[in-house]
Amino acid sequence: MTGTAHVDTFARDRLPPRDQWPELVFDLPELAYPERMNCATELLTGAIARGQGDRVAVRSTEGIAWTYRELEARANRIARVLVEDMGVVPGNRVLLRGPNSPMMAACWFGIMKAGAIAVATMPLLRAKELTDIATKSEASHALCDARLAEELDLARPACPALRRVMLFETDAPDGVEARLAAKPPTFADVRTFAVDTALIAFTSGTTGKPKGTMHSHRDVIAACDCWPKHTLKATPDDVFTGSPPLAFTFGLGGLLVFPMRIGATTLLVERPSPEALLDVVERHRPTVLFTAPTSYRAMALASGGRDLASLRKCVSAGEALPAATRRLWKDATGIDIIDGIGSTEMFHIFISHTDDDVRPGATGKAVPGYRACVLDDRGRPLPRGQVGRLAVKGPTGCKYLDDPRQANYVQGGWNLTGDAYLEDDDGWFVYQARTDDMIVSAGYNIAGPEVEATLMQHPAVADCGVVAAPDEERGMIVKAYVVLKPGQVAGDATTRTLQEHVKATIAPYKYPRSIVYVEALPRTETGKLQRFRLRQMAQEAR
């Protein structure tokens, strides 16, 4: 193992066992990186060195426009606040909480420059989920948008490692902005090793317990140098925008580090509903759009009379892209959506097609820099045309934070994404289904067991099971089968009560949009819930 610049070796000490590491592949010339690398230095200082310092790097819909030079100066000041005022040392985990905004982006880069580890969280998360993430990562510091401080305040008593929280987007005298004013615009970026952990991205697995995926500074840059360069083929004149949060690696890549690597501009939208995105395209004229299939469908249906002519590339990921949605968008804009599959574990898209080489029904081919195949349950390659487990290798790979589930995701050096695929005779990969119990609804990954546990906390519920149910608008929705306690009455009022209970306890997007009341749930003799039977019931109810 190489050296480390981390003083706090928490992440390094919690890497998976070496025999469970993915095999990394660096078979493109641009993937040859130096031993020491800080991704903020590469992305910001590098852009300025290439003569792009006066180009606009990041914009907001509220009129903020920072050049690369201004963004770096802001990130340098934030790094000074972290180190000089908050006591951050390289390797500390810094919880980052905020909507997509220029200040959120600057804070992320400030954390990178300080050699710390960013633990970004979605704005919708509640105190319980923030507690899980902060506890698992042992976050010692936090930067939080003042408008989102309430849930973090509720979480703090259960997070003993969280020593210092500082708020941004505030005029308070002890806030980040006030402290920035007293700092010079320079900072000596920590010379991290390329393999030092830069971020811990959290995702939920089938048990609902958060899994922290560790990505290095090299991972960030390698992701920038594969799919964006060889498949997206954007240019410095492009303006990126979209809906995925920067806390998702889909959003971190597509809306921050990819455009920075290219020398382009990113337009960050705090509340990117489909209607809001239509307004953004009309008013601000972005050229590259990232969002989920559900959003593309809603935008297409509401696009009548809208001027969307500035768009030239549209990217979809997060869930399967229905053929009907692809057609709707093509009819509305004349643009073929670039579909792809990625994962938090792999950082970003690893199978995709280009905008000029599309095969309806297929996700695409392995992105240059990556290899993919379909394996059987014993890890043996399957012939083309047979459905099996998708396996991937490349310059990035899964390294869970101190989690036994690493052995499930990485086997024989391959990353097993949890997706069932087949490879056709021409080498195109065709999606079949998820192989676990995750529910992918409108681009969000929702763990059924977590929703079950939340419903079971309500005094009216005796038993419940949660599965995905097909939905024309959202792809899939959360559907709950509920057994009520004696004396409780099934009906619309009870349904609304249970839905509001879930919304108030965990992130609102996880609530069951459909609730069916049953006498009993199908279980094995040992008491294990037979979710496959619930899925069958949900399919039959279409």
Q: Where do the model's predicted regions map?
A:
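Conserved AMP-binding/adenylation subdomain of ANL enzymes
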Residues: I221-V239, L246-V288, A302-S303
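Gly/Ser/Thr-rich phosphate-binding loop
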Residues: R261, P286-T291, A300-R359, R371
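Conserved AMP-binding A3 loop
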Residues: A65-R69, A198-A222
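Conserved pre-ATP/AMP-binding loop-to-beta segment of ANL
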Residues: D54, L167, K183-F202, K209, ...
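AMP-binding/adenylate-forming catalytic core of the ANL superfamily
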Residues: L125-K128, A142-D145, L289, V392-G394, ...
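Structural core segment of the AMP-binding/adenylate-forming
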Residues: M1-F10, F109, K113-R179, R285, ...
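Conserved ATP/PPi-binding loop(s) of AMP-dependent carboxylate-activating enzymes
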Residues: K365-G369, R380-G412, Y444-I446
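Conserved AMP-binding/adenylate-forming
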Residues: E62-W66, V81-K128, P245, N445
